[in-house]
Amino acid sequence: MAPDPDPVTKPTRATGPASVWYEAVMWVAMNAAERDEFLAGVHVGVLSAAIGTAGHTLAVPVWYSYQPGGLLTVLTGRRSRKAAAMRAAGRFGLCVQDASPPYRYVSVEGPVVREEELDPVERLAMARRYLGAAGGNRYVADNPDLGRENVAFRMRPEHWLSQDQGRQAQG
């Protein structure tokens, strides 16, 4: 019987680019500074919030903004299912990820501390964050009712989960 191939190139059930290194990596939790920096980066977040009392959960992609150590902000339609769920539950979660190897993610959950209109400067900054300067400017100009139709939910992060598959565990 032939010896096992090198663990880095050993065939796995994984497909795509991860199959080469899949078994040679470890999931390592990020420290507070790393998770803050990652969450502050530009990612589409997946917001989750409880719907009703039957244990159902709403999970939808959203734009968000976050400054390390501060509140996390999501912008949504004032009458949307997301807004209704966050109001009713009084809290929500958000997960962001890097979908390219080595994989990383940060998941955060906490209470809604404020619901308010997003001022025009912050609304433009969020549009530029996701669409670039020209695209953000055009998006805001083409949607003059954003200020009346949307609302910002601010969350204070309480519970964090994070993993970085590109780091080795410190032993």
Predicted regions, residues:
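Extreme N-terminal basic, low-complexity initiation segments
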Residues: 1-5
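Charged, gly/pro-rich active-site loop segments
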Residues: 6-29, 104-171
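Short, basic/aromatic recognition patches
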Residues: 21-46
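A generic secondary-structure signal marking the coil-to-beta-strand transition
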Residues: 35, 43, 70, 104, ...
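Short beta-strand segments
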Residues: 42-78, 86, 92-96, 105-108
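Short, solvent-exposed aromatic-acidic interface loops
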Residues: 77-81, 130
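Short, surface-exposed beta-strand-loop junctions and turns on beta-sheet-rich folds
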Residues: 80-82, 101, 169-170
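Short secondary-structure boundary segments
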Residues: 98-99, 157
